[in-house]
Amino acid sequence: MSLNDAYAHCDTLLKEQDYDRWLACLFLPASARKHAHALYAFSSEIARVRESVREALPGEIRLQYWRDVLNAESSDNPVAAALLETVKSFRLPLAPLQNLIDARVADLYDDGFANQNDLEGYCGETCSVLFQLVAIVAGGEANSLSKAAGHAGVAYAMAGLLSILPVHQARGQCYLPENHLKSHGLAREDIGKPESVKQLRAILLDMAQLARDHLQKAQSAVAALPPDVRPAFLPLALVHKKLESIIKNPDPARILSTVAGWRKILALWLASTRT
């Protein structure tokens, strides 16, 4: 498979598995787009490991495969081949990608988070890193991106986690910090019980407001970046309405409905005109 075919595969995979990010990539410079596809496709493959296995061990083996990929010179896997070429072309650091893989190990064991800092750290290692690397691909300087990428990743990841709470519950997962549950008199096993709805609504509201705070800080930091780099942060344009919907109605039994594609494109376009 040629590199062009590998990048085309990443394009197709991302469109199927992470449509929001795929749409956001349309607003990147053409020279950066395929590299963003490779980074996001890699992340998507790592995130899907938990869904594709029934036990932790096969998942560990799959994650180890991707660790080995990062240390390889080449690969027959199209996502891996495109990723390695992107890393090489932009001299991207491997440590953040390795940390992303390591952070996803917790998903295999359905580990929760003791506190808010742990949750924010997970969001940073699985999502902030993507904002950072895509921004570098778009021409940003690594040492100027930390604040924007850090807050952006936490806001984006938390909004995603909060919007599908029932899905996680069905899998036996919980991404709500244990100390927040305890402060409202709940334990992890209480999630889903009718008598816990009032407390869970309060927790969801708190977490959505926290994510909104990160979003506002991210937007301020992005505004200070060079205009050519700001499109790397366009996925944030899809976060605001999601968080406002949760804040307006923090229903723990609700999965946020999918927004029509044209509305997403409009939101991204409007955001792109302000960059």
Language model region names:
Residues 1-86, 93, 97-104, 123-132, ...:
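Catalytic cores of Mg2+-dependent Asp-rich isoprenoid enzymes
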Residues 105-118, 193, 197:
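Acidic/His metal-coordination segments adjacent to aromatic residues that form catalytic metal sites
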Residues 140-144:
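Helix-coil boundary and interhelical linker segments in multi-pass alpha-helical membrane proteins
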Residues 133-137:
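Alpha-helical transmembrane segments of multipass membrane proteins
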Residues 138-139, 163:
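A broad structural signal for alpha-helix termini and local helix breaks/kinks
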